[in-house]
């Protein structure tokens, strides 16, 4: 098991569209284990593979109080079951210390595979529905701050930079930024 570096906003790799998982291999199962460990270590409730620079359609989450009931969703598809959207305050491991309200459908159908390749087809609501939609956004290159005003996006970017500088000074593992092309 290994802790994986979590990409931070505005890293352009977070905008990469994830590709479907073709088969649940030993490598995928190892990634799932590492993602769950990383999510718990970061005190999160959900993590998409895109956030740890693996651009495949894979989500892990655990909404239990004891953090002992991880769920895995491979190649997830979500269908809203209600038209009305409700605001929920969201945060994100890729946008540390930034929280804001995002409106999403409160009830959805989730179709996916679990870590053993078994089909999942459930109707979910509340926090689980919101969490699944939030993590699915990551698989599509969308970050929750994209739903906010430009001013709030700028503030979020500035806050993340400050948080990362503090974390680096404290010796925490921070994902390296993608190399920038050299100026010619």
From Swiss-Prot:
The residues the record assigns to binding Fe cation are 92, 134, 138
The reaction(s) catalysed by this protein are:
N-terminal N-formyl-L-methionyl-[peptide] + H2O = N-terminal L-methionyl-[peptide] + formate
Origin superkingdom: Bacteria
Q: Name one GO biological process term.
A: co-translational protein modification
Required co-factor(s) are: Fe(2+)
Q: Which NCBIfam families match?
A: pept_deformyl (TIGR00079), PRK00150.1-3 (NF001159)
**Name under which the protein is recorded:** Peptide deformylase
What gene makes this protein?
Answer: def
């Amino acid at each position: 098991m290994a802790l994986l570096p979590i990409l931070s906003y505005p890293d352009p790799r977070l905008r990469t569209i994830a590709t479907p998982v073709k088969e649940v291999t030993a490598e995928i199962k190892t990634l799932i284990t590492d993602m769950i460990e990383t999510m718990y270590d970061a005190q999160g409730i959900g993590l998409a593979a895109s956030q740890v620079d693996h651009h495949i359609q894979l989500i892990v989450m655990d909404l239990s109080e004891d953090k002992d009931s991880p769920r895995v969703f491979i190649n997830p598809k979500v269908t809203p079951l209600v038209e009305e959207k409700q605001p929920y305050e969201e945060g994100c491991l890729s946008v540390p210390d930034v929280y804001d309200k995002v409106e999403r459908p409160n009830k959805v159908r989730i179709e996916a595979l679990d870590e053993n390749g078994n089909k999942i087809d459930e109707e979910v609501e509340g926090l689980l529905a919101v969490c699944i939609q939030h993590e699915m956004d990551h698989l599509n290159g969308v970050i929750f701050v994209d739903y906010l005003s430009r001013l709030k996006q700028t503030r979020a970017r500035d806050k993340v930079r400050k948080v990362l500088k503090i974390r680096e000074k404290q010796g925490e593992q921070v994902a390296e930024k993608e190399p920038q092309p050299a100026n010619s």
